Structures are given as C-alpha cells and as structure tokens.
Amino acid sequence: MKITGFRLGMLRVPLKTPFKTAVRTVRAIEDVVVLLQTDSGHIGYGAAPATAPITGDTHGSIIAAIQQYIAPKLIGQDVADLNRLCALVQHALERNSNAKAAVEIALYDLWAQALGTPLYQALGGGTPRITTDITISVDAIDTMVADALSALARGYGSLKIKVGKDSESDVERIKAIHAAVAGRASLRLDANQGWTPKQAVRTMRTLEDAGIVMELVEQPVKAADIDGLAFVTARIDTPVMADESVFSPIQAIELIRRRAADIVNIKLMKTGGLSNAIRIADIAALYGVPCMIGCMIESSISVAAAVHLAVAKADSITLADLDAPALGQFDPTEGGVHFDEAQLHIDDSPGLGIRRIRGLELLSD
C-alpha cells in the first residue's frame, strides 16, 4: 500500500458550553483534518486543533507545515515502512507538533488498515475499552457544583476540576465540589501552570488539611519550572502530574530522573503523534511511573488514536482524560471508537475504523 496523495480539510464542532481554563477559553472544536490517499483506495485519517497558547500551533501553521514540508515527503512511500515514515515526519521541520501528530495519526491508521486489524491490536492488543474523566471548567462556584453533579448523573466517576486563576477562590471551589460530590467521584485538579511553587504547596496543603483527598494535581507551576515542579512534588501528599512540562521522550526521562512529578500526561498534540507517545509510555513503564492519556479540545478523529494507544499501553497508561468528544454538540465521525460519555469502546474495524466524517469541508488543492 503506497501513499499517492493527500487532502486537507477543516472540521468545526461547537461545544455545548465554553471550555474555560487558567490559560484560555474555547467555544468550538476546530480541527485541521488530513486525508492520506493510497494506491489501494484506502484513506488514512488524522486531525489536529490549533493550540497556540500551549504548543504554538495555529491552523495556518498546521496547514503550511503539512502542505509544504511533511506530506510531500510521503508521496510514493509504502505504509509498511512505518518507522521510517514517522522519522520523515518528525525531521521534516522543527516544532510544529500538532501538524506532525495529524500526519502520524493518518499513517498509523493506514498501517493498521494494511494489516487488516484495529490499531490497538497492531500496537500490541488489549481490552478494547477505557473509562475517561470529564472536565469541570473554571466558573462561578454554583455553576461548577452544578456541572459536577450533572457529570455524576451521566455516569462519570472521575472529575477533572480546572483551577489556577486565584488560589483562595480555588480552595473554595474545591471544597464546594467535594461537599456536593460526597465521595461519589474522585477529584483531579488541573492548575494549567497557574500557581507559583509556594502557592501550589500552600493551596494543596490547605485542601489536604481539610481532609479533601484528591487523586492528583496537574501542572501546578509553569512548564519550564522543573525545579518548581519538584519542589511541589516533594512537599505535598497528593500525586503531582506533569503535562505541559513533558513534550518529548527526553523530557520525560529528565523529569522522572529528577523525581519532579509522580505521573506523566501524554498528549498526541504535544508529542507530535503516536511514535513519541509510544516511547514515553514505554519509558514510564520501565521506571514504574504511571501515565495519563490526555487530549486538547480536539475531535474524535485524533482522540480515537489516543484511545487505541491507551488500550495497547495499559501497563503504563492507567488514567484517561479523553473527554473532548463529550464536550462537543455532536460526534462527527462514523465508525471506530464509540464515545458514550465516560465509556469509550473500540469496534473491530481495521485501523482507526473511521468510515466517514460529517461536516468536513475539504480545502482546495
């Protein structure tokens, strides 16, 4: 199966409600979609959102990187030579991790289709279902409590609560949600780099001293402040998870060796696709460090790839935060992964299993 061409498109899925963090507010999933075409008629699907505040990628940069630098290198290549093709993608240009992720996802989709098996089986197999948490966005306390109770009613057993704008208000938010949930769900906090190291320790100790048990706190300090992250990790009981601090396998090794965090959050848009995500999961497994599989505000195309990865690497990926499809007003994909609130199931279709994408607007060649 050889790659003969590619097309790009745009996909927009409005969110049910705005998604608010300490960093940004998002109102819709807006993905660049890549379709890799082959001589056998098979199509590989990949996608990536713009995440300028996190990775630096915009829709324009994603399109330019794929059109001008990445996709042309793949024309005429056999998808069976997956490792070499992924190396071509990664070395096509510096940074641009979202663009690389979109193309790599499409490559892995084609590779598994050529093998005639679902992607997770090609990656090593596993039980084709996982459970995700759901995010409670930063908002007024009453609204966040109502959102938490609504999530419980829809079957979610883990709530990821956005904090990080103001530590005193954060404490009140968590206390209110903790009281309302009353032990019916685990609580995960995500500060999105919003605290200083001392603020993080003070805030978390206040919550811990109040008897509030939290499953983890994610990226409490600035991404580049590894010393600060280690400072927090050493001084609180709640496990600390690194997100924006870990994009690459090398960063994962450094963070683990310095004991700067207890958990690593893997996101395909940070790692530049599946090849580096697999490396990070394997590194974490060697060190006995658990991982979360996470996502940006992105469509079910790329999240499906993350689900396949999580199933195949269940020895190290023990937590999932793949709620973006549940935040959208509709699921644009048909086939592959079935997103049913907290329960994510993979069918037995080859590759990602995507048959059609509703609402996709192809760009002119």
Regions found by a protein language model. Name each.
Residues 1-40, 45-55, 327-330:
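Structured beta-strand/loop patches that form or line metal/cofactor-binding pockets in enzymes
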Residues 3, 34, 41, 70, ...:
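Conserved, mostly hydrophobic/aromatic
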Residues 4-15, 29-31, 296-365:
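Flexible C-terminal active-site loop/helix
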Residues 48-57, 135-139, 292-295:
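Glycine-rich phosphate/pyrophosphate-binding beta-alpha loops
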Residues 113-137:
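N-terminal small/glycine-rich loop or linker at the start of catalytic domains
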